[in-house]
Amino acid sequence: MKRFSKFINTSLIALALLLASCGEDRTGEFIAKTEVDHWIEAQMQDIYLWYNEIPKLETSYYFYPADEFFPMLLSSNDKFSYIEMLDQETASAGTKSIHINSTTYGIEFVLTNDPTQTTSHQYARILYVLKNSPAARAGLKRGDWITTINSKNLTQDNYGLLETGNGVTVTIAPIILTEQTASWGEATEIQIQAAEAMENNPFLVSEIITSPQSGKKIGYLVYNEFVTGKTPNDPTDTSYLEEMKTVFQNFKNEGVDDFILDLRYNNGGYIQCAQAMATMLAPASSLNGEFAHLVHNDKRQDLNYTYMFDSNYSSENLNLSKLYVISGVYTASSSELIINSLRPYMDVKLLGVQTVGKNVAATQINSPYNFIMYPITATVYNKDNQSDYANGFTPDYTINELNYLNWAELGDTKELLLYNTLHLIEYGSAPDAENSESSGGEEGGDEGTTKAVKHYKSRQALQISYSSISQKTRPAIIATQY
C-alpha cells in the first residue's frame, strides 16, 4: 500500500501547488474532496487487468462520487467490474454484516414482455419461491405469472415492490391457449404479508432420483450461488462449504451412478467454492491435478496462481466419469469455470441455453470509504490453457425453458430440463432439444413439458431482470480478497 500512497501524494501535491499559486491556498480542501477517487485510481492502476486502458481524466472528474468515478476507469472490454456502495450502518459494522439475511418476500422472478402480445405491459414470471417465505405462504409457486402489483402494471421502476416491503397485493393469471389465440385468463388477487429476513441457502434442491427403467441412482443438485457461507462478502465464513461437504457425502453414501448439476440460475461467486465442488465431482484419478489457473496483468505476475483440486474435499469425491450440467441465460463465471475446468478430465454434457461468457476473475477490494470494489484482475484458464468461452458455452442440447408454458417445480421429474436430462441419461437423447435429432418427439410426461403452440410469442423474454434475493448482481468469479 505504500506504493499507492506515494502515487496519490505526488499527484495531489502537484495539483495543490497549482491551486495555491492562484491566490488562496485551498490545498487541504482539494485533497479532502479528491482523496477517494485518487485512491480508487491507484488501486486500479496496480491490479486491474486492463490497467493500460485506464483513461487520463481531467481534474474535475476526481470530485465525482465513487460509484460514478469508478466506471470512468473501465476498459471497453470490461463488462463485469463493479463497485458496491455500503450504507453507514453496514460499513461501520464491517463487511461481515453484509447480506447475512435477506429481507424478502421470497420470490425469484424474471420480467418479460406480454407473451400473448395483446398488451404493451410487462409481466413477472416466478422462477422459484423460497420455502416458508411470505410468498410461499400466500400460495405463489414456480411458473405463476404476476400481472399487477398493488393494482398497477409492472414496470422497470416498480418491480422492486415484488422483492421486499411491508406487504404487497399481486394478481396472477393463467395464459389460455387455443389453436389460434393466446389470451390472459381470469386473474386472482393475492395478498403477500410483510417481507421477512430469510436465509437464502444456495442448495435449493438436493435429491437422489432412482430410474424406474434401469434402477440407476442419479444425484440432482440445484445450486444457485458459489458462496462460502451465510455472509457472502466474507470468504472466511465457510458454513456453506461445510454444508456442501455434507450434501456430497450423502450422494456418495447413496452410491449415485450419475449426476445432474443444475446451474441455470447461478451466475457465479467465489472460486474456492467451484474448486471444492469440482473436487467432489471429478474422476478420482484426477485429484492430484490442476483445477484452474489465473493470469494477471504484466505488472502483477506475482499474483498468478494455480488452483489444484482441493484435498480437503477428496473424501466426498463421487468419482464420476460424466457430468450433466443444466444451464440458463444467467449461468456465468464460476458456473462456467466448473464446465471449463472439468472438461479436460471428464465428459461434461451441457443442456439448456447459451451461458453468459465470463472467463475472467474479479478481486474483492475492501476500502476505508464505505464501498467494496470488484475489478476484473485476471483471465481464468483450465489445465489445458483453454479460456475460449468469452461468448459463453453453447449447449450440447438447446432447450430454453422461457419458451414453454407449463412449468413443474424444480426437482419434479416432469420439469422440462430435468426430464430431458434424465431422458438423455437413460436413452441418449433429449426429446425437446432444438438441436437434437429427436427434437419435437416425445414430451416430458403429462403437462410438465407441454410446448407452447407456435403463436405463443414469448420466445424471447425481453428486458429480463432478476429480483435481488440471490444477489444476482455479482458478475464474475471472485478470486481473492485484496
Ranges and model annotations:
Residues 1-11:
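Bacterial N-terminal signal peptides that target proteins for export
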Residues 18-21:
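C-terminal motif of bacterial Sec signal peptides marking the signal peptidase cleavage site
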Residues 261:
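P-loop NTPase catalytic core of nucleic-acid-dependent motor ATPases
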Residues 23-258, 449-482:
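Flexible, low-complexity junctional segments that flank or bridge functional domains
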Residues 264:
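Short strand-turn motif at the edge of the Rossmann-like AdoMet-binding core
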Residues 10, 28, 330:
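Conserved aromatic-histidine-acidic binding/catalytic patches
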Residues 221, 225-236, 251-258, 267-482:
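C-terminal "post-core" interaction segments
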